[in-house]
């Protein structure tokens, strides 16, 4: 395992740790999720380039499309929740409340 792979895995682990520690606000959770997806995208791109497997060349592009969709849906939910509740605290998102 090269130093680049170790750094990308460390970036993924730090984003996951940030998601677990700072999950009180929706915006910080979305930023940590975006960091995780971005590190996975770079890792998938490097792995695809090193493996020379031609059928796997589409995997990073598909991952990038899903990341863009995830970011758009997350920001739309953030705007809707901020307009409805006036805050972006995750604890206010209980579906059992009337």
UniProtKB/Swiss-Prot annotation:
Keywords (A to Z) from UniProt: Electron transport, Membrane, Mitochondrion, Mitochondrion inner membrane, NAD, Respiratory chain, Translocase, Transmembrane, Transmembrane helix, Transport, Ubiquinone
Major subcellular location class: mitochondrion
Listed transmembrane segments: 1-21, 26-46, 59-79
Catalytic activity as recorded in UniProt: a ubiquinone + NADH + 5 H(+)(in) = a ubiquinol + NAD(+) + 4 H(+)(out)
Subcellular location: Mitochondrion inner membrane
Keyword Glycoprotein set for record: no
Entry EC no(s): 7.1.1.2
BP GO terms, sorted: ATP synthesis coupled electron transport
Molecular functions per Gene Ontology: NADH dehydrogenase (ubiquinone) activity
One cellular component (GO) term of this entry: mitochondrial inner membrane
One Pfam match: Oxidored_q2
Lipid bilayer topology: Multi-pass membrane protein
Function comment: Core subunit of the mitochondrial membrane respiratory chain NADH dehydrogenase (Complex I) which catalyzes electron transfer from NADH through the respiratory chain, using ubiquinone as an electron acceptor. Part of the enzyme membrane arm which is embedded in the lipid bilayer and involved in proton translocation.
PANTHER family: NADH-UBIQUINONE OXIDOREDUCTASE CHAIN 4L, NADH-UBIQUINONE OXIDOREDUCTASE SUBUNIT ND4L
Family: Belongs to the complex I subunit 4L family.
Subunit structure: Core subunit of respiratory chain NADH dehydrogenase (Complex I) which is composed of 45 different subunits.
The protein, known as: NADH-ubiquinone oxidoreductase chain 4L
Source organism (scientific name): Pontoporia blainvillei
Encoding gene, per UniProt annotation: MT-ND4L
């Amino acid at each position: 395992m090269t130093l680049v792979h170790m750094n990308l895995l460390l970036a993924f682990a730090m984003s996951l740790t940030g998601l677990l520690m700072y999950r009180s606000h929706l915006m910080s959770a979305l930023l940590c999720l975006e960091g995780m997806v971005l590190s996975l995208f770079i890792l998938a791109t490097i792995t695809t380039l090193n493996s020379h497997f031609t059928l796997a060349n589409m995997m990073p592009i598909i991952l990038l499309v899903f990341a863009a969709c995830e970011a758009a849906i997350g920001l739309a939910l953030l705007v809707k929740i901020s307009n409805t509740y006036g805050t972006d605290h995750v604890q206010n998102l209980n579906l059992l409340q009337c």
